[in-house]
């Protein structure tokens, strides 16, 4: 084929090239920590610890196909920083659509769930907070009306399979597979559209810091089921009795309202980690994210407003995940699901190997119950008197995977959780945090307010403010972590700590291609104080063929 004919084909396919070049310089008043909203929910482009930083960010997307039924693009993005360790290939992907089916391969700064991350605290899972990780994705990423329903039944959903980065930390598990999926349904066809969705994220496989290979049972992890592949590995008993891999989930429900062109989105989300919180309308789980986002049709200076309340402080209470206590031999034992045989002979053999007849009779006389296979959990709880078990959910953390749901030192979920590295910087040697897991402050109650607008032409702004009460972690405050029975007397979060986060971003278009921007952010409260300023410019190139 001649060069002329190739060019004709490209022209007929309406291929186009989009290039965006930006540069910025920032400085912070705090030599250890930058204000939260100066770097969060921005795909990990900016450093959370560099006091002064110059960043150059370039990205390009090239449309290979652009048809009604199919499109295909390739993209590449790079970040250069005066902090050389923060320089990286940020994006490299192939993505497209075949009829209603979307697909992607590689690292792309995109999440189908991150809708209002610039005005809210951000998505609890699959957020825009950290740098993109390599993955393959397939699904219907936006609402699609089921044929012959006249838009009354709409669905969206998708599955991703990828890898976490092998970062230089001796505590990290290497070669970790990350699987994420979501499924939503909505009643459309009217100006009020109720919806319900489920999001599930799971880590599986890898090599532990001790060099031990973690078996992969894909379908058990996919479905959140236990796996016999872990039965003979003493350090991974929980995978054989609870669920294979590390799991996080989210129920997402709400209303989309379109009123005279103004769009209102009400949402209520409930996070969970295992069966203890999987019921979308159950009363056991008290943690949630609820909010409202309003986009105004004809308003310029106030084009959108959001209000959100996040609570993750309960985590089903202080009780250990499973029953734990001292048996008649003085041994501290944790009882996992499946440890106690349910057949008559096996059950009593297990009971008498750990408890005396006097223990059993004392409990039966006090409660009026008769011990058997179906009430042994009540016996264990009340005999050991350590409170209800099934708590300490430790959101976005996992015992097998120290790094939890993080990439590049940032949460791939909500940015309001603090890592151990961050906490050490603001503790200033006060109190104690033993560092059992990556996120040492994941019990947070927060209110976030966001505003955006402009003159409708050249000037635009975004303002976001968050007030938070930080309670640390239920696992970090006990000696021994998740199954610890004794609290640290000098735990840093013995009392909750209040913190404020605020940011304002202003953009001004000098031309269709060139704009300048400024960001002013500040944090203050009982954790740390910091003020940061960033100024920058952005240049866009769009070529249509």
Residue ranges and their predicted role:
Residues 8-12:
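Sec/Tat signal peptide C-region and signal peptidase I cleavage site
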Residues 13-54, 65-76, 155-161:
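Transmembrane beta-strand segments of Gram-negative outer membrane beta-barrel proteins
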Residues 13-19, 60-72, 97-101, 143-157, ...:
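Short loop/turn motifs that connect adjacent beta-strands in outer-membrane beta-barrel proteins
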Residues 18-20, 49-57, 87-91, 133-137, ...:
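Transmembrane beta-barrel architecture of outer-membrane proteins
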Residues 23-31, 62, 76-82, 98-100, ...:
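Transmembrane beta-strands of outer-membrane beta-barrel pores
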Residues 66-98, 110-129, 167:
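Surface-exposed loop and membrane-interface regions of Gram-negative outer-membrane beta-barrel proteins
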Residues 113-217:
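Internal, well-ordered domain-core segments that constitute the primary functional module
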Residues 194-198, 209-211, 215-545:
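Exposed, low-structure sequence patches enriched in small/polar residues
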């Amino acid at each position: 084929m001649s060069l002329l004919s190739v060019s004709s084909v490209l022209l007929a396919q309406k291929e186009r090239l989009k290039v965006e070049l930006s540069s910025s310089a920032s400085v912070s008043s705090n030599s250890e920590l930058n204000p939260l909203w100066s770097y969060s929910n921005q795909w990990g482009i900016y450093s959370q610890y560099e006091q002064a930083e110059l960043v150059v960010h370039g990205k390009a997307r090239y449309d290979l196909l652009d048809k009604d039924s199919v499109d295909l693009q390739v993209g590449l993005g790079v970040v250069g920083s005066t902090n050389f360790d923060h320089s990286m290939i940020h994006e490299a992907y192939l993505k497209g659509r075949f009829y209603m089916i979307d697909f992607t391969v590689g690292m792309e700064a995109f999440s189908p769930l991150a809708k209002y991350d610039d005005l809210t605290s951000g998505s609890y899972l699959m957020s825009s907070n950290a740098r993109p990780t390599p993955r393959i994705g397939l699904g219907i990423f936006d609402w699609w009306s089921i044929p012959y329903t006249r838009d009354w039944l709409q669905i969206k959903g998708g599955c991703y399979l990828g890898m976490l980065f092998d970062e230089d930390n001796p505590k990290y598990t290497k070669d970790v597979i990350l699987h994420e999926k979501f499924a939503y349904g909505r009643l459309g066809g009217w100006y009020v559209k109720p919806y319900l969705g489920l999001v599930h994220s799971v880590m599986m496989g890898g090599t532990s810091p001790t060099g031990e290979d973690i078996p992969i049972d894909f379908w058990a992890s996919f479905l959140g089921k236990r796996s016999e592949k872990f039965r003979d590995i003493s350090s991974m008993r929980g995978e054989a009795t609870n669920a294979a891999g590390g799991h996080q989930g989210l129920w997402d429900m709400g209303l989309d309202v379109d009123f005279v062109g103004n769009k209102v989105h009400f949402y209520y989300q409930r996070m969970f980690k295992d069966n203890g919180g999987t019921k979308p309308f159950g009363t056991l789980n008290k943690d949630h994210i609820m909010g409202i986002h309003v986009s105004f049709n004809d308003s310029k200076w106030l084009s959108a407003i959001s209000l959100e309340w996040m609570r993750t402080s309960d985590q089903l209470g202080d009780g250990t995940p499973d029953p734990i206590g001292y048996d008649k031999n003085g041994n501290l034992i944790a009882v996992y699901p499946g440890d106690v045989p349910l057949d008559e002979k096996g059950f009593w053999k297990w009971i008498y190997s750990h408890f005396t007849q006097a223990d059993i009779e004392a409990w039966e006389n006090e409660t009026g119950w008769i011990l058997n296979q179906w009430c042994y959990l009540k016996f264990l709880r009340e005999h050991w008197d350590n409170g209800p078990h099934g708590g300490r959910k430790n959101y976005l953390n996992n015992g097998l995977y120290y790094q939890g749901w993080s990439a590049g030192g940032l949460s791939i979920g909500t940015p309001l959780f603090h890592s151990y590295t961050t906490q050490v910087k603001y503790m200033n040697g006060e109190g104690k945090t033993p560092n059992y897991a990556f996120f040492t402050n994941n019990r947070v109650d927060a209110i976030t307010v966001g505003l955006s607008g402009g003159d409708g032409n050249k000037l635009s702004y975004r303002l976001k403010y968050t007030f938070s009460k930080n309670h640390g972690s239920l696992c970090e405050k006990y000696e021994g972590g998740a199954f610890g029975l004794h609290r640290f007397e000098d735990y840093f979060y013995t009392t909750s700590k209040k913190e404020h986060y605020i940011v304002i971003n202003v953009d001004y278009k000098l031309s269709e291609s060139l704009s300048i921007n400024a960001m002013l952010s500040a944090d203050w409260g009982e954790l740390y104080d910091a003020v940061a300023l960033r100024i920058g410019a952005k240049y866009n190139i769009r070529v249509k063929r």
